[in-house]
């Protein structure tokens, strides 16, 4: 009734005014932190704020020749290979596996992700159960959907989105959605 199929709609400018007119829009007083995370950079920014609030309040159980640059949150089940650098502003979910000499910063890595040796991830959101090959470079504001595969030696330009379960074996040199 309020949202027409097949076209973009602005909730704030189109739907909310109609709901107000009909007396169907209600509010809730909330004392906590709230932010709009409709874009990748917004989601990453709120993660920075949350990680800053955790600084010094958690322990990382990371062993060996691994560099941690706080703030970082690593699930206890995450494994990180020798020579890798995690952070600042990195989140590693459950059962994330990071290979040797990988570098991850300003990124959120969801559960079950496998990141191979010598990969560089900076400012990305990587969905669940993604496989990242060796020597991969993922640039800022990239979003990788669940179950995607990024092959060895692939570079993704800033702002690339990869749809879920998509396999990518060639560089993506411009900001676009890979379907």
Give residue ranges: language-model regions:
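Tandem repeat scaffolds
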Residues: 80, 86, 95, 145-151
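Catalytic-core segments of class I nucleotidyltransferases/pyrophosphorylases
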Residues: 1-56
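Cytosolic beta-strand hydrophobic patch enriched in CBS
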Residues: 27-30, 58-59, 108, 162
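Long, charged amphipathic helices and adjacent flexible linkers at domain junctions
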Residues: 50-76
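Glycine-rich hexapeptide-repeat left-handed beta-helix
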Residues: 100-179
């Amino acid at each position: 009734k309020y949202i027409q199929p097949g076209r973009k709609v602005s909730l704030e400018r189109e739907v909310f005014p109609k709901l107000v007119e009909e007396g169907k829009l209600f509010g809730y007083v909330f004392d906590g932190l709230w932010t709009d995370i409709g874009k990748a950079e917004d989601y990453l920014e709120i993660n920075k704020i949350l990680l800053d609030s955790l600084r010094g309040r958690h322990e990382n159980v990371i062993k060996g020749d691994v560099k941690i640059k706080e703030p970082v949150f690593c699930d206890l089940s995450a494994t990180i290979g020798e020579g890798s650098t995690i952070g600042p502003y990195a989140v590693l979910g459950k059962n994330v596996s990071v290979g040797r000499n990988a570098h991850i910063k300003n990124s959120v890595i969801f559960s079950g992700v496998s990141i191979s040796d010598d990969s560089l991830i900076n400012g990305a959101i990587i969905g669940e159960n993604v496989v990242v090959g060796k020597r991969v470079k993922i640039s800022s504001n990239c979003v990788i959907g669940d179950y995607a595969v990024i092959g060895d030696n692939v570079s993704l330009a800033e702002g690339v989105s990869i749809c879920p379960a998509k396999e990518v074996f060639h560089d993506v040199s411009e900001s676009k959605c890979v379907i």
